[in-house]
Amino acid sequence: EIGLGIPAEPLFRSSCLMSPYTSEEIVTRQFIIGEKPTGIINIVDATNIERNLYLTMQLMELDTPMVLALNMMDEMRGNGGTVRINKMEAMLGIPVVPISAAKNEGVDELVDHALHVAKYQERPGRMDFCGEEDHGGAVHRCIHGIIHLIEDHAKAAGIPVRFAATKLVEGDQRIEAALKLDQNEKEMIEHIIVQMEQERGLDRAAAIADMRFHFIHQLVEQTVVKPRQSKEQLRSAQI
């Protein structure tokens, strides 16, 4: 337990994409949906933020209190980079804490924020990431149309409805099975998704990925001053 008698929750590192087909995504979401943790500390590598925010967005859709920890900020600053923390918090709707785990910098502040969001159950303030890339609002309408159809099913299954709707668009059969939809509902959902694909000119999975990556690009563009690449990063990129 960490202070205040609140059980410590697992730390999730955003080092992989939570696609419908990865074991990491399945284990992560099964734990969060099934165990209902009081909060999540999501640790990402500050020197490679753009790559690591995809999982963060998917975790936010699970509607669980979360703090985003930007690790290795000392290295980022040493290479001439920085992050506009307040701006990033405003755009994501969750607390963002710069830390250096290796030097034990910012860790106390991270724990304080984690305890606060867990105690008061402060959930992510933003879960709709549709932006200007969603020409005519096709993805937005698709997700919200599905939400309207599955609200009762999601509640009965204990699955956050926005997360469930997004996963249905991505073709996640585990979520579909958990929702126990009837054939008529499945056909209506398929019709909504096909209509979205036609409007966007992208298949369903690509449309969702495009939505997320566009938001990440906008977020990084507005909040991150990118550092010079270290020798280690250059070698990693070449590999």
Q: Language-model features: where?
A:
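Short, small-residue-biased leader/transition segments that mark boundaries at the very start
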Residues: I2-L11
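Switch/connector loops and helix/strand junctions flanking conserved nucleotide-binding motifs
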Residues: L17-S19, I49-R51, E75-G80, N104-E109, ...
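Gly-rich Lys/Arg/Thr-decorated short loops/hinges at beta-loop-alpha junctions or inter-strand turns
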Residues: F12-R13, E35-T38, L68-A69, I193-E199
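A short hydrophobic beta-strand->loop->alpha-helix junction that borders the nucleotide-binding pocket
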Residues: F12-S14, V44, I99-A102
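Conserved nucleotide-sensing/catalytic segment adjacent to the nucleotide-binding pocket
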Residues: F12-T22
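Conserved C-terminal guanine-recognition region of P-loop GTPase G domains, centered on the G4
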Residues: S23, V27-V97
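Canonical P-loop GTPase G-domain recognition
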Residues: D74-G131
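Extended helical scaffolds that flank P-loop GTPase cores
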Residues: G93-P95, Y120-Q238
